[in-house]
Amino acid sequence: MLLVMDVGNTNIVLGLYEGDQLAHSWRIASRIERTGDEYGILLANLLQLKQVDAHGINGVILASVVPPIGSALVRAVRRYLGLETLVVGASMKYGLPLSEESPSGVGADRLVNAVAVFDKVAHAAIVVDFGTATTFDLIGEQGIYLGGAIAPGLNSSLDALFEKTAKLPRIELFHPERVIGKTTEEAMRSGLYWGYVGLVDGIIERMRVESGFANIHVTATGGLAKLIARDSRCIDDVDDMLTLTGLRLLYQRNR
């Protein structure tokens, strides 16, 4: 079995593959203060709850945008599983030509998503990943990674609105029934949601025009992908496990 780990600023998503099939997945909070032992115990408990024999895991791959957490997980895997972790980095075989000056300048999660989406559609594509930041990545018709854009995440924008104002309350984010809010909370929810749908569609449309590609498939992933996709004119599909799929593909290309 293959254990894949995607470390983001807010969450860590773990997946366990049997061959090409995702057998189990978990989402846990990213906590920079946790030690390798704490992550090791947490991992052991997750496996035990699914009645997974840890001795059946023979490979581990990790992509992390939070270096201290990535390092703690590497130590946890070494101590509790007796395995060395393949860490996504600049020296890997991505199977994608890179047009940027150096792959080290691109977040590991973004390259992993690019690998997964091109394997999926085999032509020009845009990946929109809704996380603490929302990333937009363009892959060309020949699988060339062309770059992208980074915007503040929707929850990050919500937090900033609450923290930087004196009277606006903290609100729960869900699909608003109307654009014209009748209360302060409704108005905030409407502005954040519909404003963000406009941001997403606007960036995608500009990337389409700037790239000149006639046919671009747009895949969304990340925690808020389904929420925004329901009103987006540009998102073609939502793939919650896109990053995990990319990690599996990278492991297979680099083992």
From Swiss-Prot:
GO MF terms here are: ATP binding; metal ion binding; pantothenate kinase activity
Binding of K(+), residues? D129
Q: Name one Pfam family in it.
A: Pan_kinase
Alphabetized UniProt keyword annotations: ATP-binding, Coenzyme A biosynthesis, Cytoplasm, Kinase, Metal-binding, Nucleotide-binding, Potassium, Transferase
Indicate whether Heme appears among the record's keywords.
no
Q: What is its main location?
A: cytoplasm
The cofactor named in the record is: NH4(+); K(+)
Q: What EC class does the entry list?
A: transferase
Q: Summarize subunit and interaction data from the UniProt record for this chain.
A: Homodimer.
Q: What does this protein do?
A: Catalyzes the phosphorylation of pantothenate (Pan), the first step in CoA biosynthesis.
UniProt family annotation: Belongs to the type III pantothenate kinase family.
In Swiss-Prot or TrEMBL terms, this protein is called: Type III pantothenate kinase
Source species of the chain: Magnetococcus marinus (strain ATCC BAA-1437 / JCM 17883 / MC-1)
Instruction: State the organism's lineage.
Output: Bacteria, Pseudomonadati, Pseudomonadota, Alphaproteobacteria, Magnetococcales
Q: Which gene encodes it?
A: coaX
